[in-house]
């Protein structure tokens, strides 16, 4: 991996939830290259283990259900046994659910045969809020307790749709807004303990999961891509590597030691664009 710059995290231990995924997996690799001990937590142990193996001897994979406090406590104990303490926590677990996703942007009186707002399922809403907000709450409760005595750094993953809710995903947009608010609350609450808390708010990035929504099989952009880029002043999608600089800056006490309570968009200007 080519880092935009390198910070020295030797002797620091970072716990990353959702580390088997695309974005947080790359985060873990970058942190490992900077010398950190990295604990990769994911309910998909095989995915996390594969990335841990790439990082090397300073990384371990741990199966963790971020909605089960006993599972989180067990994961925390494993990290402490391996590395002694946790200095940085990255709450990266999250996602959406089709049961909380509309088919269309707008509701019309004569709309029929589509999944509109009234067809959204309560179970989908609860799933999305649990996966994004409750997981961050539970993991922080367990992992930050040790930081109260030692100081620490918490980085949450929000989204640009916390600023501008995306039209078809009300639950996910609201959940990420909750993450942004929770980030600010934690920053104030933990300030006397020398614990900083910030969030990164990614914009649109091309990943294996969404590539089929953004590009046709022949490589041409879909209509959705056209709408996204029209609302992105930089007129391009982000690359996962674009997030690494922000991550490393927030991880460095020397570079961002007076920064807490911020939610930083990395979105090519999407959250700033009004369209008029």
What function would you assign to each model-found segment?
Residues 159:
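Residue(s) in the substrate-gating loop at a strand-loop-helix junction
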Residues 151, 191, 196, 258-260:
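Short, small/polar-rich loop/turn modules that mediate ligand/substrate recognition or access, typified
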Residues 73, 96-126, 145, 168-171:
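Conserved mid-core segment of classical short-chain dehydrogenase/reductases
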Residues 236-266, 271:
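C-terminal substrate-recognition "lid" of short-chain dehydrogenase/reductases
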Residues 109-137, 155, 179, 234:
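Catalytic Tyr-X3-Lys loop
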Residues 165-173, 185, 213:
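Active-site loop-to-helix junction immediately N-terminal to the catalytic Tyr of the SDR YXXXK motif
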Residues 140, 175:
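Active-site helix of classical SDR
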Residues 5-39:
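Canonical Rossmann dinucleotide-binding motif of NAD(H)/NADP(H)-dependent dehydrogenases/reductases
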């Amino acid at each position: 991996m080519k880092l935009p710059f390198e910070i020295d995290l030797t002797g620091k231990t970072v716990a990353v939830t959702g580390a088997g995924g695309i974005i947080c997996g790359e985060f873990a690799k970058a942190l490992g290259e900077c010398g950190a001990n990295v604990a990769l937590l994911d309910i998909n142990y095989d995915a996390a283990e594969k990335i841990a193996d790439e990082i090397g001897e300073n990384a371990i994979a741990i199966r963790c259900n971020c909605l089960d406090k006993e599972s989180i406590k067990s994961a925390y104990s494993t990290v402490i046994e391996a590395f002694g303490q946790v200095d940085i926590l990255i709450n990266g677990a999250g996602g959406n659910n089709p049961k909380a996703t509309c088919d269309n942007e707008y509701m019309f009186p004569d709309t029929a045969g589509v999944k509109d707002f009234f067809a959204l399922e309560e179970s989908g809403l609860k799933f999305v809020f649990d996966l994004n907000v409750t997981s961050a709450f539970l993991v922080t409760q367990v992992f930050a307790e040790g930081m109260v005595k030692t100081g620490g750094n918490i980085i949450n993953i929000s989204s640009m749709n916390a600023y501008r809710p995306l039209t078809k995903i009300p639950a996910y947009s609201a959940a990420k807004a909750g993450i942004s608010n929770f980030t600010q609350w934690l920053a104030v609450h933990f300030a006397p303990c020398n614990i900083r808390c910030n969030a990164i708010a990614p914009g649109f990035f091309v990943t294996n999961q969404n590539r089929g929504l953004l590009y046709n099989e022949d490589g041409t952009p879909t209509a959705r891509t056209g709408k996204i880029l029209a609302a992105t002043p930089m007129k391009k999608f982000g690359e996962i590597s674009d997030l690494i600089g922000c991550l490393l800056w927030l991880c460095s006490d020397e570079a961002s030691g007076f920064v807490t309570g911020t939610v930083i968009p990395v979105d090519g200007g999407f959250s700033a664009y009004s369209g008029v």
